[in-house]
Swiss-Prot record:
Site keyed Transition state stabilizer: positions: H178, R239
Its biological purpose: Catalyzes the formation of acetyl phosphate from acetate and ATP. Can also catalyze the reverse reaction.
Organism expressing this protein natively: Bacillus mycoides (strain KBAB4) (Bacillus weihenstephanensis)
EC number: 2.7.2.1
Alphabetical list of SUPFAM superfamilies matching this protein: Actin-like ATPase domain
Entry's family note: Belongs to the acetokinase family.
Name of the gene: ackA
Record's keyword annotation contains Nucleotide-binding: yes
Residues that bind substrate: R89
The keyword Ribosomal protein appears for this protein: no
Listed name of the protein: Acetate kinase
Example GO BP: acetyl-CoA biosynthetic process
Residues at which ATP binds: K15, H206, L207, G208, N209, G210, D281, L282, R283, G329, V330, G331, E332, N333
Length: 397
């Protein structure tokens, strides 16, 4: 048995989960928020109870030290020697990383170089890695990339119709994201279906504030809705998803905004927030629609119709699907959104049960037993995938 920490470091946050492996028992989990501010928040779950502390955590190194101290103070580990490995979520692995990898100096340099492709995320992920290296330098650490799962996409899926030299010189192509989540839920779907994943064609719908759809054939990603960045694809909470690229200079001309300002609008003020004018949260928007708000209705219609585009496209690509999976915050918890996405898909063999669909945050088949295409709700677990990869690559006994 070995204890493994799964880490997701943001620019001002640190999410953690400690596992006993290989049993995959969660020993504790928590979150450090507002790092760098005087009123940082440290939350940890001990014996099923949340402990919350507001204190000054100036940087990630202090957050890591505090986390490790809490583990021993609360008796979750007797000593730090019990920690056998650390897994770090890294958003962008580019074309360099098609799998998770043991972190060494070369890997760190590669992640840094790839920061060009994910300027908001990779630098923060690096800070988390370095903070742990300072405190636990001899513990094996593994980088788990959001993009790695999608490295199996064929050129026909990942190339943009741009001058080929842009791809060769600048790495401009579709990378895709949420890979760890799509991998987890498709592998779990194969288990639930009782069939080898190699025999399955699956549609994975990761619907949260960020959202992406993936076509997974034989356990391999063959296409996904996000692109060079997580801005592409379906309509999201605050992100536009796909738009006509010529709109960017047009908006600049009309508003006097810089390209950076327009891109910021596309990332932070568009999507459901842009369409409604008041919220990126689907629960608020559904409530407003029930009150008769027209823009709420239109926003929800746009959200669903963009998902339909990918379901239709990927079903054609795979010549049919065996199952559609719903995961992430909205996919796991919104029966209304699932129902709207599935309505009218009988032509492709989808027959879902409204009663079975009334589930929230738990695994369930929501299709009728006779439905040729199975519909499954699967709560995602990116942290356990990270822990599994640490166990696989870290030579941990």
């Amino acid at each position: 048995m070995s204890k493994i920490i799964a880490i997701n470091a943001g620019s001002s946050s640190l999410k953690f989960q400690l596992f006993e492996m290989p049993s995959e028992t969660v020993l504790t989990k928590g979150l450090v928020e507002r790092i760098g501010l005087e009123d940082s928040i440290f939350t940890i779950t001990v014996n099923g109870e949340k402990q919350k502390e507001i204190t000054n955590i100036p940087d990630h190194a202090v957050a890591v030290n505090m986390l490790l101290k809490k583990l021993t103070e609360n008796g979750i580990v007797k000593s730090l020697d019990e920690i056998g490995g650390i897994g770090h979520r890294v958003v962008h692995g580019g074309e360099k990383f098609a799998d998770s990898v043991l972190i060494d100096a070369e890997v760190l340099a590669d992640i840094e170089e790839l920061s060009d492709l994910a300027p908001l995320h990779n630098p923060a992920n690096l800070v988390g890695i370095k903070a742990f290296q300072e405190v636990l330098p001899n513990v094996p650490a593994v980088a788990v990339f959001d993009t790695a799962f999608h490295q199996t996409m064929p050129e026909s899926a990942f190339l943009y119709s741009l001058p080929y030299e842009y791809y060769e010189k600048f790495g401009i192509r579709k990378y895709g994201f949420h890979g760890t989540s799509h991998k987890y839920v498709t592998e779990r779907a194969a288990e639930l279906l009782g069939r080898p994943i190699e025999s399955l064609s699956l549609l994975s719908c990761h619907l949260g504030n960020g959202a992406s759809i993936a076509a997974v054939e034989g356990g391999k990603s063959i296409d996904t809705s996000m692109g060079f960045t997580p801005l592409a694809g379906v309509t999201m909470g605050t992100r536009s998803g796909n738009i006509d690229p010529a709109l960017i200079p047009y908006i600049m001309e009309k508003t006097g905004q810089t390209v950076e300002e327009v891109v910021s609008v596309l990332n932070k003020k568009s999507g459901m927030l842009g369409l409604t004018g008041y919220s990126s949260d689907l629960r608020d928007i559904i409530a407003k629609e029930e009150e008769g708000d027209h823009r709420a209705k239109v926003a929800l219609d746009v959200f669903v119709s963009r998902i339909h585009k990918y379901i239709g496209s990927y079903t054609a690509r795979m010549k049919g699907v065996d199952a559609i999976i719903f995961t992430a915050g909205v996919g796991e918890n919104s029966a209304i959104i699932r129902e709207r996405v599935l309505e009218g898909l009988e032509y492709m063999g989808v027959y879902f049960d409204v009663k079975r669909n009334n589930v929230f945050g738990e695994e369930a088949f929501i299709s009728f037993p006779h439905s040729p295409v199975k519909i499954i709700v699967i709560p995602t677990d990116e942290e356990v995938m990270i822990a599994r990869d640490v166990l696989r690559l870290g030579d941990i006994g």
